[in-house]
Amino acid sequence: MTGLVHELIYAGGARAPAAPALQDGKTTLDYAGLAGEVSAAANFYLGLGLERFERVAVYLEKRLDTVTALFGAAAAGGVFVPVNPLLKPEQVGHILADCNVRILVTSPERLELLRPILPHCRDLRALVLVGDKPAAPVDGLALAHWRDRQGAPASAPHRVIDADMAAILYTSGSTGRPKGVVLSHRNVVAGAESVSQYLENTPEDRILSVLPLSFDYGLSQLTTAFRVGACAVLMNYLLPRDVIRAVERERITGLAAVPPLWVQLAQLDWPAGVTEHLRYFTNSGGHMPKPTLDGLRARLPKTRPFLMYGLTEAFRSTYLPPEEVDRRPDSMGKAIPNAEILVVREDGTPCAPGEPGELVHRGIHVALGYWNDPEKTAERYRPAPGQLAGLVIPELAVWSGDTVRKDEDGYLYFIGRRDEMIKTSGYRVSPSEVEEVVYATGLVAEVAATGIAHAQLGQAVVLVVYDPSGGADVAARLLAECKNKLPGFMVPTHIEVREEPLPRNPNGKIDRKRLAGELAGLFEEAAP
């Protein structure tokens, strides 16, 4: 029985050692080779003093070493923390400090960018560098080289069970900095089992890994492939057309992406032969526009579309079967295998068909909570509705904060987000994190970041600022500072400068909802 994350790979090595497991460019590791790399990484970490449940952060672009570094941490009995390579040093520093990372795996080039923030990461003990470029040591930190992992002596891993921590994935909250969602081995493995079941994955599949591995959706492409003995093909793309070329060149059978990428892919020509091997495509991270779905289906007539909805806090929640797409193209579908999705009122009682309510996810996919954030964990992870009074220990469920409705047949439809998160390009962006960068410039007196509907992005990040000085170049200066301090997906698409204070709600806070309403039609002409 496979119960631990890394055992997905080990099981493949035992079952079909010569089968291709992981490909990056012209280099392919079979399952035996990948299992050996994961074991070598685990021994390497243990030799560096990694203790049970200690965190290993990996801050690299997508490559073979990234995958083995992540799964090797789990195999050692530690916890892996994939860090989005698009993040800026200050954001990486927050993650390293917040979850008390002990070992950081990165490149010499990225290390140079991180040097100013490393003194603030007080739990960090060792740096592991991937690449041959020399790097100066950092005071107080052991410096090791990834190339030395094969020489590490074999060590017994720390004992863990499937209920223990496996990974921490960082996702933005509605207030403050990104929060770490703690996933157990059971969460990750069960997610792979559920997804591979409804996608009907087999060892013959070749799944293109386009999304960041710091996304649960991106990580899922690996675990789903490993669960069935398929091959995951890694890709760092520059242009949407590169994705199409990779699908054709590598004879990809499964492709996952977020709506902004699908919007672009639906506007391009696809080679005629692709549909002969591309079995399915999946969408999550936001609603796929109907014109985009229609465009993809016209270009890929034999490829089955799976429209999904998920929470990092519970992996994946729902999917719409391809045979229902024509009847219910706006639906989120129903619960994935081994999960139950409830729609409830504020008092926890079930909603009637058509009645809006909060989506609550219960089952094996529910994560362990937010790292180092008991208040947010208590808010989001609460007893599941409708439990029997005799249960002494209540089952916890994820209360999503999303408003949905269920039709007479049990299919779900998304209505809106109850918090103020901005969902852009498949990312969740905290308004306050963007606002902090703007306030730090000292250029404006007030700022509010909000998400405005956008045909390509899902939502666009929009800033409204109050500048009493009336400076003519404030918007340009703020945009330049945001580009310098924030990853691309957090940079505002539009900045509106006002000469009067921003509107307030009854509590004296800036009224984001009012601002969002005023700007609701800002991007209507951007629709394809």
Model-predicted segments: where are they?
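Conserved pre-ATP/AMP-binding loop-to-beta segment of ANL
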Residues: T2, A18, G151-Y170, R177, ...
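Conserved AMP-binding/adenylate-forming core of the ANL superfamily
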Residues: T2, Y10, A18-R63, V67, ...
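Conserved AMP-binding A3 loop
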Residues: D30-G33, R159, A166-A190
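AMP-binding/adenylate-forming catalytic core of the ANL superfamily
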Residues: L87, L104, V247, L255, ...
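ANL superfamily adenylate-forming
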Residues: L111-D162
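AMP-binding/adenylate-forming catalytic domain of the ANL superfamily
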Residues: V130, P487-K509
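Conserved AMP-binding/adenylation subdomain of ANL enzymes
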Residues: V189-R206, L213-G254, L268
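Gly/Ser/Thr-rich phosphate-binding loop
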Residues: R227, R249-A257, A266-R328, E340, ...
